[in-house]
Amino acid sequence: MKILYLDCFSGISGDMMVGALVDAGVPSEKIEVELKKLSLSGYKLQWGKVVKKGISATKFDVIIQESIEGGHHHQSHHAHRHYSDIIDMIRRSELSEEVKQRAGQIFHCIAVAEAKIHGIPVENVHFHEVGAVDSIVDIVATAIALTELHIDYIISAPIPLGHGSIRCAHGVYPVPAPATLEILQGVPVVSNHLPFELTTPTGAGIVKSQVNSYGPLPSMKISAIGYGAGTRDLPDQPNVLRVVIGEETRITSSGPSLFHSKEETVYILECQLDDMPGEALGYVMDGLFQKGALDVFYTPVFMKKNRPGVLLTVLTSATHVEQCEQFMLKETTTLGIRKDIWVREVLERDVVTVATSYGNIRVKQAIHKGKVIRQMPEYEDVKEAALTHQVAFLDVYAEAAEQARRRIKGE
């Protein structure tokens, strides 16, 4: 398992994250090539080496060309974009599905926080700082770099916040900014004496949406270390984000895996229906899976005026939220959709192939603490074998399960 550890002793921002990942080995040329797949212009990327309190680090900057031409510093340039515009731009791009998913997760995490703070629906969130070109580039570049590194599991140290005040689009706000604090609910944070904003909303969104667990540096075989520089010079410590990359190690050859499960962010869409025929409900379920839903199910409910109906529940990733939502509004009779964001704990899993008298059958395995605790023959393989050999489904299933059990025991 390939692990990424975020050592955020001076906080985290989008540009620090990108700089650290490039410093750890991601080619900057790869990020530049991939970013060209976005329908985004008016900027150029700048990479350089700087020294922060004795530590050499990679500094990443997004230079807004329109602002340069107008004689203004790039940080004062803030394009105003809606969340839906940004997600649509990412979805329509030729970026890989993993990059789209990671970037969508980060933006959705920030949008949910902004919506709560401003008291508006998520789809109406109007971004200022995070809608600016430089922040869009920071987030998508982070997704590109994580995908390029093939990271399986991310751990972070507690997040330092700083204190004081900052000026943003709505005026002078306290540090940490309201969006940062809202995003980091449930995340271990630490305060310190530094009167600066150490963690930005973009940095908080990256942490909340991408990190699987929090704590000290785990036991691992280190393969790369990277430092990403922030802009400000801190008085007593280097303003850098350190990332450590390596492979999971075990304490002993027979010891359990250090990582028993991981957290994933899923998005919930729901609506109640009492005036649709069963055939239409079946069509809706099929269509939602085609749109990228992770799961779709109906729950019987009684609605107003004692009408029997169903509660339609859809689980999906951030990348496919809007597609599923639009499909529900188009293909069902609902007048609105409830949306929520959940975090789920999932076991490590893999798939093995076993030989049976009916042919090869794939078997899904659930793994906990390094041990296989459950094995489930794949339905489609079992079904195909049963139909091909004209035998009972359960006969094929039982033999595949037995062969998988023997494989684990080395028989």
Curated annotation (Swiss-Prot):
- This chain's protein is named Pyridinium-3,5-bisthiocarboxylic acid mononucleotide nickel insertion protein
**Which Gene Ontology BP terms does the record give?**
protein maturation
Instruction: Say yes or no: keyword Isomerase present.
Output: no
Name of encoding gene: larC
- Any signal peptide, and if so, which residues? none
Q: Does the keyword Lyase apply?
A: yes
Looking up InterPro entries in the UniProt record yields: Ni_insertion (IPR002822)
Q: What is its EC number?
A: 4.99.1.12
**Family named by the database record:** Belongs to the LarC family.
User: What keywords would UniProt list here?
Assistant: Lyase, Nickel
The record describes the protein's role as: Involved in the biosynthesis of a nickel-pincer cofactor ((SCS)Ni(II) pincer complex). Binds Ni(2+), and functions in nickel delivery to pyridinium-3,5-bisthiocarboxylic acid mononucleotide (P2TMN), to form the mature cofactor. Is thus probably required for the activation of nickel-pincer cofactor-dependent enzymes.
> A single Gene Ontology molecular function, please?
nickel cation binding
What's one Pfam family here? Ni_insertion
Q: Which catalytic reaction applies to this protein? A: Ni(II)-pyridinium-3,5-bisthiocarboxylate mononucleotide = pyridinium-3,5-bisthiocarboxylate mononucleotide + Ni(2+)
